[in-house]
Amino acid sequence: MKNFFSFSKLTPHLKNIYHRNMTYTTKQVGETGSLEYRLFFLKDNKPVSSFHDVPLWVNKEKQIVNMLVEIPRGTNAKLEIATKEYMNPIKQDVKDGKLRFVHDKYPFNYGALPQTWESPEHTHPSTGAKGDNDPLDACEIGSGQGVTGEFKQVKVLGVFAMIDAGETDWKILCIDVNDPIASQINSQEDIEKHLPGKINEVYTFLRDYKIPDGKGPNQFAFDGKLQSIDFSMKIIEETEAEWKDLVGGKTKSSLSVVNTTLNDSNTVTADVAAQKLNF
């Protein structure tokens, strides 16, 4: 996959998405539901990477992180961060030249935690498998439907140790801090009390969503049990450290690490990024 997607002939569409304590603008290139579709991010009208420039932590002591919504609840287009492309826009995954859709609609908002990375060079002792080369995934179980490109501030509630095609693929369970019942949910017991059956619903979906495509169920460490908040925080910290090794050049990778805010060897000015993107 090329590190830069050519879209000079496509018309960008500007859309504002407001976030708590920060405002991002998304710029869409190509039509939704097309191979050309890309959703780029700007802050203060300057290009930023959704992977590298948006901070992970909102309040570490309270286990609150930023989550980028890729696939809103109730939808099934397989949207994801384009980790190998310049400035890491969101795109729709492609398989055999066709846009990818999951058979069943997601029963939660699905997305990723910025400034995290599951290194394919690291075998995790809990799973016996190497990382899947992507940011940490997150499943947000609040009542509201997210929007693709929205950054939610979410409270960490647990993690599933999924093993997908032989690779470690952690799934953080979380809830939007602005959800009406977020303040009442601080443990697995609280989830079962206020959202009975939700943990099993998330687990079952993650386990079985590839079966209609002719594949077997995904595997899980810990017998598929949701792990504690403390364990989840350790996983987030580990993948944050692996991300730092990625952008710091300690781990070699084909992923794009270009950014506009980190002030490292991969940082470019906003003007350079905008020119490259034809913004």
From Swiss-Prot:
State the InterPro entries in the record.
Pyrophosphatase (IPR008162), Pyrophosphatase_sf (IPR036649)
- What EC number(s) does its UniProt record assign? 3.6.1.1
- SUPFAM superfamilies cross-referenced by the UniProt entry: Inorganic pyrophosphatase
- Molecular-function GO term, any one: magnesium ion binding
Question: Pfam families, alphabetically?
Answer: Pyrophosphatase
Binding of Mg(2+) 1, residues: 132, 137, 169
Annotated binding of diphosphate, by residue: 100
Gene3D superfamilies with a match to the protein in the record: Inorganic pyrophosphatase
Q: Which UniProt keywords apply?
A: Hydrolase, Magnesium, Metal-binding
* Catalytic reactions of this protein: diphosphate + H2O = 2 phosphate + H(+)
Amino-acid positions noted as binding Mg(2+) 2 in the UniProt annotation, renumbered to this chain = 137
Q: Name one GO biological process term.
A: phosphate-containing compound metabolic process
Cofactor or coenzyme needed: Mg(2+)
Q: Does the keyword Metal-binding apply?
A: yes
Q: What are the disulfide bonds?
A: none
Record's GO cellular component terms: phagocytic vesicle
Q: Which family does this protein fall into?
A: Belongs to the PPase family.
Name of this protein: Inorganic pyrophosphatase
Q: Print the organism lineage.
A: Eukaryota, Amoebozoa, Evosea, Eumycetozoa, Dictyostelia
